[in-house]
């Protein structure tokens, strides 16, 4: 499977086959045409088709930026990964609709560098769509985000959504952000909108790890 889309003047591509994946981010920077490539266990940055050497801090920053955008774009893909720890919480109502509330964390072994992050998903009890999600993170000083889905559409049978992106003070528990949303405590900071989405279900993985 291959998925491509544009997000904030950057082009993203995900190629996934039998557990192998290659995530790519391409954009024009001051140095030239930049292409970040993140596969199962390797990251590299190309500038004008030449690989450049990166220190560990920059490598992590670029890798996280590439991975996080594609991760959220492809939800709920990968939520059944063996390293995911799931906890069904108390069901809640948001805007008059009933939701299953599921907390997810990642194991230290196989969960990546951000294994301490916490994710919460609100799953509609009627159609089982993820209408809301939240997460806490520790990089760059930490913080929390709450996202409200809109513009849901299916392309080649795969559901894509855009999101209204909210925040509150960084120590607020991600698990309680539904309450903060319902009581108008959150601040809207951006919209997460995917453009020019394309799906090729017949594509095989070209670049092996």
What are these regions (language model features)?
Residues 29-32, 51-53, 138-139, 168:
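Short, surface-exposed beta-strand-loop junctions and turns on beta-sheet-rich folds
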Residues 99-199:
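Gly/Pro-enriched, hydrophobic low-complexity segments
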